[in-house]
């Protein structure tokens, strides 16, 4: 049976940690006839009760692993720590705030099973964001795509599914190339 790993970085997410866990597991259990799963939560030096909540969750679910940083190292460091510790055939990376809906997992996995090595979750709208945020996001993606040999779809964020072979390559890159 293939395994799906879900990497979820958290920084001061005590308000949503349990809700996030329940929604993610609920959607993974719908696929349990075809896939096993693991959840890797990365506590990025939270100053609230995020770590205690994660420990309680992990004590009741053997599919949950926790990586905890001594201080806040940043979102990307947390993601990299997570992907370096996955054991799955595919990895879903998502934010804990549930702007990336776990209800899309099944469709992402279906695309992966059809041969895609990377499946992006793209936002339909950027509702609730300021004009400044919208403009800087547009500038970021335009600049990134001019500098990159590979086009990065706009408004994708970190919500994606990545095949194991891609994860293995990413994990070998030196820090400054990630």
Language model features by range: what are they?
Residues 33-46, 67-68:
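Short beta-strand/loop segment that forms part of the nucleotide-sugar
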Residues 69, 94-96:
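Catalytic metal- and UDP-sugar-binding loop of GT-A-like glycosyltransferases, i.e.
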Residues 3-5, 38:
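Cell-envelope/extracellular polymer assembly enzymes that use nucleotide-activated donors
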Residues 69-71, 75-85, 101-178:
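Acceptor/aglycone-binding surface of glycosyltransferases and processive sugar-polymer synthases
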Residues 15-18, 48-57:
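Acidic helix N-cap motif at the loop->helix transition within catalytic regions
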Residues 13-30:
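Short, well-formed alpha-helical segments that are part of the catalytic scaffolds
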Residues 91:
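Short aromatic/hydrophobic "clamp" motif used to bind/position activated sugar donors
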Residues 43-51, 98-99:
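A conserved acidic beta->alpha catalytic loop
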């Amino acid at each position: 049976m293939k395994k799906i790993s879900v990497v979820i970085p958290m920084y001061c997410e005590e308000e949503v940690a349990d809700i996030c866990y329940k929604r993610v597991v609920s959607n993974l259990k719908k696929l349990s006839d075809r896939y096993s799963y693991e959840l890797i939560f990365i506590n990025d030096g939270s100053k609230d009760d995020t770590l205690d909540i994660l420990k309680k969750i992990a004590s009741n679910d053997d599919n949950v692993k926790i990586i905890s940083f001594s201080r806040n190292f940043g979102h990307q460091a947390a993601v990299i720590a997570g992907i370096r510790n996955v054991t799955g055939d595919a990895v879903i990376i998502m934010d804990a705030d549930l702007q990336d809906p776990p209800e899309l997992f099944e469709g992402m996995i279906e695309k992966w099973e059809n041969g895609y090595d990377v499946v992006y979750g793209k936002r339909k709208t950027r509702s609730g964001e300021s004009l400044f945020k919208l403009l800087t996001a547009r500038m970021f993606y335009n600049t990134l795509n001019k500098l990159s040999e590979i086009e990065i779809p706009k408004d994708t964020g970190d919500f994606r599914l990545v095949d194991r072979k891609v994860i293995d390559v990413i994990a070998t890159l030196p820090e400054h190339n990630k």
